[in-house]
Amino acid sequence: MYVRHLGLRDFRSWACVDLELHPGRTVFVGPNGYGKTNLIEALWYSTTLGSHRVSADLPLIRVGTDRAVISTIVVNDGRECAVDLEIATGRVNKARLNRSSVRSTRDVVGVLRAVLFAPEDLGLVRGDPADRRRYLDDLAIVRRPAIAAVRAEYERVLRQRTALLKSVPGARYRGDRGVFDTLEVWDSRLAEHGAELVAARIDLVNQLAPEVKKAYQLLAPESRSASIGYRASMDVTGPSEQSDIDRQLLAARLLAALAARRDAELERGVCLVGPHRDDLILRLGDQPAKGFASHGEAWSLAVALRLAAYQLLRVDGGEPVLLLDDVFAELDVMRRRALATAAESAEQVLVTAAVLEDIPAGWDARRVHIDVRADDTGSMSVVLP
């Protein structure tokens, strides 16, 4: 798989650009702040419908405009597929597949399969649980695009249920008991969609675990052994150890956990149980990586998580596109060499670098130089001829 064309309109610092890309390695070179990462971000958005840098879409739209467009042509086994994504201010985002409108942007997920390595990856080890949950969900969505709808529906139900919890004090004051009947309805829906999301994550962690261990050993052979596990906000004993996860059992346990925390939730006005409270646990030896891993160990573990994702996608069938955003600058010589070796099998590798010295020695790659120009509308990124 490779991206043959990337077109941007009013995306971040890019007013207008059309890039013809090729299989093999391409390096986007330019000083920091010139817009290199925005190219990688656009491709990652096309992969997961989300940015790896911000949680909202608004910052992706160029200042002074009301919409951004990302256009890609992806080649997979000789077959071309065109995707256009429109990110809009104040209205629903739109998508087209092979120039035809689709019902939801989620319908284009899976066309581009990519793995992203970025400086933000250190947050997978040292950051909040939300960073690790997003890692799992993004990978699950790339492998099984239907998970995007599951997550979206879970988040919708979670918002509705949280709003209802916050309204309970007022309902009690008015003597309105119907709010509790409504809460039970939302409990059932949260348990249904939450169980499906948790099942997908547990299944993914079970497959990732041996790959993370192998990748970390390659990157840090002198360090302790790496391991991962899934920590849920409810009892998942049994299902987490099974290859065929019982979603009905998970839903029943989630429903029971919601009932057990009902009083605390009503008091605080927040949902205390569900996949939005879960975490991916990372360990080195018998210690949690967060707080105990050195800087080098943390980077090795972060890269190992991405390499494990890459390996799973390869096993699924087809080489995913590798997106390397300034990551070589963050790694020492040994880790650079290990990552470069792993990238050799990819059909396409797209890399950003502030200076060419950040690229591993001996890497044969096309070079695309990025600059910044100014006009009446402000500064914008451009590709140098």
Swiss-Prot record:
GO terms for cellular component: cytosol; plasma membrane. ATP binds at residues 30-37. Keywords: ATP-binding, Cytoplasm, DNA damage, DNA repair, DNA replication, DNA-binding, Nucleotide-binding, SOS response. One of its GO terms (biological process) is double-strand break repair. GO terms for molecular function: ATP binding; single-stranded DNA binding. It is found in: Cytoplasm. Its main location: cytoplasm. Co-immunoprecipitates with DarG in the presence and absence of darT. Belongs to the RecF family. The RecF protein is involved in DNA metabolism; it is required for DNA replication and normal SOS inducibility. RecF binds preferentially to single-stranded, linear DNA. It also seems to bind ATP. This is DNA replication and repair protein RecF.
